[in-house]
Amino acid sequence: MRRSALINIMVKAADKAGRQLLRDFGDVEHLTVSRKGPADFVSQADRRAETIIRDTLKEARPEFAFFGEEGGQTGPEEPEGRWICDPLDGTTNFLHGLPHWAISIALEQAGVIVAGLIFDPVKDELFWAERGHGAYLNSRPLRVTRREDLSASLFATGLPYKGRDNQDGMVASVERVSWASAGVRRAGSAALDLAYVAAGRYDGFWERGLSAWDVAAGGLIVNEAGGRVTDFEGGNRIVSDRSIIAAAPMIYDQLLQLVRPKSGA
């Protein structure tokens, strides 16, 4: 698949930031780290990577706004589009020397995500998609798994840090899915979890308490790989609802029933 000019701009930004992140990862013990909330950290690496991505995208498309995890939204008041970026998804993994983290960049136009990219610099894996044109890992087309048997399926999730009640509900859903399936993994990067669903490595993923930069790119990539992506009510408000379920079509309904909030959960 030949990449469009927009995807090439995103790839350029991710590649530049990825090289900086790899340098920081090799010197992680010397990074300055601060805490944004319970178990929610930000480092020099996050900020440096976001600056690189923002500046690269702004130079190429000054008419677009930029919405990043660390710096909020900048750019024109009436932009033609908006970049949505997590410069380092999996910061806690990164700071502990675990090589499981990624860069996530999406482009939103008229309220619709039209392009998305997730880049894992450690493995040199680039997951990307454009609406209506399929999803790819580097240059290889992606398809979600065709597995139909829930008991043989492998899932991924994350547990929220904000609010005991919210976490208790997620723990309960993890227990239900674990009993019904081949297992549940919590690897610490929602972006890569979604990319792995698109690649057929996981059969599905669900999580609550996420932000736009966590799901914007990954949700599109899963959709373009043939998966189903909704919020916990089965709707399409994955950004505003702050919840997401993404799965292969034959597994989706079964997963939704298991993870949908129950009374008291």
Language-model features: locations:
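Acidic active-site catalytic centers that drive phospho-/nucleotidyl reactions
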Residues: 40, 44-46, 50, 69-70, ...
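An extended, acidic
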Residues: 143-265
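N-terminal subdomain of lithium-sensitive/metallo-dependent phosphomonoesterases centered on the IMPase/IPPase/PAP
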Residues: 1-88, 250-257, 261-265
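Residue-level signal for inorganic ion chemistry
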Residues: 21, 46, 57, 91, ...
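Small-residue (primarily alanine) positions within well-ordered alpha-helices
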Residues: 10, 14-17, 116, 135, ...
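DPxDG-like acidic metal-binding loop motif
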Residues: 77-136, 151
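A short, compositionally biased
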Residues: 28, 101, 129-133, 223, ...
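Short secondary-structure boundary/capping segments
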Residues: 33-34, 58, 73-76, 118, ...
